[in-house]
């Protein structure tokens, strides 16, 4: 059975971009693959965090994963920092990577632009991501468009390490959802919907009440010509809504576009579709968070399962590179 790995940061409250671009696909994958999913709390440390808030957000993010339908009896769900092999392998891969290829990472360029002080962790972030993936002999990685470059680096590092020290890592492949791989901000459709960027009207959080969802969709930026047409280059706001509608309803982009001749009805139906789709997820979230010990208990169980695999991979890599056995 193929193994699938993916992760989500605990840098803020999960939103519909996370759900349609990742969580929902993960739920489907768990039935057909050996699935490993991770709340990557170490990655959140690339920027300064409030300790109490980070702990809270890590638990919140994990709770939404379970509420979305991930079954801890079928797949593995854990917090990255609970499995120390992630940082252990990251160092071996940092010594395999070059400064030049890390400088070419688009996300580093974007996130460091205009900043007077940038953490070294932000620079080496893609290497830790590579360690996350390679630790689990991963075959497939569900990624958004913005993570493809990091996955290519992961593949390059695996091939390079294998070439130097013998076959050690499985070289993973990317899987990108055909629809809603990258949900954009409702107010700034030129940028991705984000947990870490403050945009109250631009982000639909999974916890949002129905009326809040309706209001955000109603106020979503479109354009002035009034023609319902899917055209991401010239009509990014409307095209984002069409993609989101297609993802939420299971319809094609062409079908959604052909069904409307005005923006108002499209927005209204999209809002109601989102409310309907998110309602059972929100109900499960309320149920699981009613027991404050439930999520920590499930994460501990997942970390034990993940650690059993990760320890073997790190041991193999250490031996290959020439380190003494502890």
Where are these regions (language model features)?
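Internal, conserved structured core segments that host functional sites
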Residues: 112-161, 165, 185
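Short catalytic-loop micro-motif centered on adjacent basic/acidic residues
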Residues: 76-79, 142, 225
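N-terminal Rossmann-like or analogous alpha/beta NTP/dinucleotide-binding catalytic cores
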Residues: 2-131, 276, 286
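Short, histidine-centered active-site or binding-site loop motifs used for metal coordination
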Residues: 8-10, 41-43, 139-140, 197, ...
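Short helix-capping/linker segments at secondary-structure and domain boundaries
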Residues: 99-103, 135-142, 246-256, 282
């Amino acid at each position: 059975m193929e193994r699938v790995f993916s992760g989500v940061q605990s840098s803020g409250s999960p939103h519909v971009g996370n759900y349609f671009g990742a969580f929902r696909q993960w739920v489907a994958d768990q039935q057909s693959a050996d699935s490993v999913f991770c709340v990557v709390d170490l990655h959140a440390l690339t920027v300064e965090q409030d300790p109490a808030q980070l702990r809270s957000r890590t638990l919140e993010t994990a709770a939404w994963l379970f509420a979305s339908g991930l079954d801890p009896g079928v797949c593995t769900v854990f917090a990255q920092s609970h499995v120390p092999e992630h940082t252990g392998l990251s160092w071996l891969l940092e010594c395999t990577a070059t400064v030049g290829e890390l400088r070419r990472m688009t996300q580093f360029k974007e996130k460091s632009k205009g900043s007077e002080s940038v953490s070294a962790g932000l620079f080496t972030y893609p290497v830790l991501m590579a360690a996350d993936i390679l630790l689990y002999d991963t075959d497939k990685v569900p990624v958004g468009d913005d993570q493809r470059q990091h996955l290519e680096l992961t593949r390059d590092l695996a091939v390079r390490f294998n070439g130097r020290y013998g076959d050690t890592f499985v070289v993973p492949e990317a899987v990108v959802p055909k629809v809603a791989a990258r949900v954009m901000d409702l107010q700034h459709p030129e940028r991705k919907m984000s947990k870490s960027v403050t945009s109250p009207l631009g982000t639909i959080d999974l916890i949002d009440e129905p009326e809040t969802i309706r209001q955000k969709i109603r106020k979503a930026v479109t354009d002035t010509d009034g023609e319902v047409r899917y055209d991401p280059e010239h009509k990014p706001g409307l095209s984002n809504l069409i993609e989101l509608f297609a993802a939420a309803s299971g319809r094609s982009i062409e079908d959604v576009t052909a069904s409307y001749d005005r923006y108002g009805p499209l927005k209204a139906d999209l809002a109601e579709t989102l409310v309907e789709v998110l309602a059972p997820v929100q109900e499960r979230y309320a149920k699981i968070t009613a027991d404050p010990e439930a999520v920590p208990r499930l994460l501990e169980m997942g970390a034990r399962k993940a650690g059993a695999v990760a320890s073997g991979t790190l041991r193999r890599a250490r031996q290959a590179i020439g380190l003494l056995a502890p």
